[in-house]
Amino acid sequence: MFTLFLLIALSSAKVYFHETFENRDKWIDSTSSGKALGPFKIVSGKWYGDANNKGLQTSEDNKFYIAAAKLDEEFSNKDKNLIVQYNLKFEQGIDCGGGYIKLLPKKSIESEEKFTPESEYNIMFGPDVCGGSKRTHVIMNYKGKNNLIRKEIKCESDDISHLYTLIIRPNNTYVVKIDGVEKQEGKFDEDWDMLAPKEIDDPNVSKPADWVDEKEIDDPNDKKPEGWDDIPKTIVDPNAKKPEEWNDEDDGEWEAPTIENPEYKGEWKPKRIPNPAYKGEWVHPQIANPDYVYDPELYKYDSFAYIGIDVWQVKAGTIYDDILITDDIEEAEKEAKVILERNAAEKKMRDEIKEAEKQKEEEAKKEAEKQKEEETKEEIKKEENKEEL
């Protein structure tokens, strides 16, 4: 029976969207966002694993990039795996900008050009970098609310391509991979605040009035030293002298400046000691939440119809490529293997380019130093000739 079910599942496995960017015909820029959009370009990039492989690149700094494409067909992931996978390169050396994608239901927009940052989406997935923050977003919409994953998933921020994979299973579990390596996995009801909490504070219990939660107290045996408050904060500078040119009649009576008193110790405070009555931090007793109801279909969306890119980039140059949306894990893994091999070749080319640039810079530096040395010798020679004359 299981074998039959497996064969049926494999035979019905489908690819709903596969974009390798031979062109950008599927992608329509937003005309409804009200923002000044930067243009996308189809490029191979400065370094690549295959010169014939293209991607969709952001091309102008400090611009929004908002475009959408229609999936090959509308579908629901009910009772099926959902795999969202794509290759992304921050070729520009990202400092602040996103590289994520959004999956939208049919009801969200009438057509691709109607896509805006406010359009409702089912899932937002992918890297987002700004300053020290480098995270992979996995935002799930549930009953109209966008829920951020509670776990932190670091993203890659260098200038080579990385493959991002999100797997959602019909048992309410998920996996996030980067470059084929699992970075996070878990359960929907544990890693997102989609449902009401399973337990809540018992409303019939309050912290006892005599509960002591102060760890330390003032030492009752510590006394303020006599004369403590008599020490002034400032004193007359003993090294100050009235200027010889000072005239009391013209300048007024001279007053020596004051300085901070090295003997002054500030406000006296008694020493602190452990509180013998301390009971520890009071923990509110928990009870089962009567509003908690488990949803076995947290993973499920009735409609996937569009994919959108909606990012702001301070520094442009990000390249999207190899976007795959399918319910076939084997198909995604097969494609990932090819992409990762190509990414390895891309890294090799990038390293060779960087090494050549480094050598060129070093040679230019040596040439400049040599030139400066020759100029110095020439100056010395000129000075010597002047002295002889």
From Swiss-Prot:
Region (4 X approximate repeats): 183-248
Cystine crosslinks: C96-C130
Each Sequence repeat, start to end: 183-194, 202-213, 219-230, 237-248, 252-262, 266-276, 280-290
Annotated region (P-domain), positions in chain: 190-301
Residue numbers binding Ca(2+): T20, N52, N53, D321
Induction remarks: Up-regulated during the early stages (30 min-2 hours) of the development of amoebic liver abscess in the host followed by a rapid decrease to basal expression level.
Keywords carried by this UniProt record: Calcium, Cell projection, Chaperone, Coiled coil, Disulfide bond, Endoplasmic reticulum, Lectin, Metal-binding, Repeat, Signal, Zinc
Region (C-domain): 302-389
Motif, Prevents secretion from ER: chain positions: 386-389
Pfam families membership: Calreticulin
One GO BP annotation of this record: protein folding
GO MF entries: calcium ion binding; carbohydrate binding; complement component C1q complex binding; host cell surface binding; unfolded protein binding
Coiled coil location: 329-388
Region (3 X approximate repeats): 252-290
Quaternary organization: Interacts (via C-terminus) with host C1q.
Name of the molecule in the record: Calreticulin
UniProt source species: Entamoeba histolytica (strain ATCC 30459 / HM-1:IMSS / ABRM)
Designated gene of the protein: CRT
